[in-house]
């Protein structure tokens, strides 16, 4: 029986591609309203982990429960319970901001007054009022980011996945984005983030540091740094990268 405060639980989660084990025996729990960071060098298993949690690929062993849904037994149901946003945003650039939101609201099954009401809520929450009739393709990186988040939030998902969401976005927009993420977490949304920015990783309540498919360290930024032997999170990340490179050369 899963604790009602736990929104995501991974049990011996493993994924192999032939002889290569991308994720090995991952055991984690993530609480409701937690901002949780997945951190690690390229090839560490972050993306594979997220793909399993989103129901896009099946685990080779183990399982995970996401917002009450088993990723092995009901992968299609997971898509109704999660929001996903990547650095590419997934927008239709030849549609306006309003048209993009209306399209995604329809994809998620919102109709009539509930559809219009939810769009209005998200527009207000993210400050998109003055951009509604602008083509998505003409937006700056920061505004595309807001629109991508708006589309991901349209169906009120209890779990939100952010895959390097601020890549290529200016510092001011990044700061504003994280204020929004904190507000979402305060409302009870569980947010799982991958990022290469150490300052952003430090904003997460907890971090799972991965390397070559293994969970290396878990805790706050300071705790993770200490577990790896670094003076801070950035130093710990560099130490881990150097270890990986030495092992690959050996």
Residue ranges and their predicted role:
Residues 94, 135-139:
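Conserved ABC ATPase signature
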Residues 102, 106, 111-131:
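Conserved ABC ATPase "signature" region
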Residues 156:
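Conserved catalytic motifs of ABC-family nucleotide-binding domains
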Residues 160-164:
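Catalytic Walker B motif of ABC-type/P-loop ATPase nucleotide-binding domains
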Residues 218-219:
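ABC ATPase "signature
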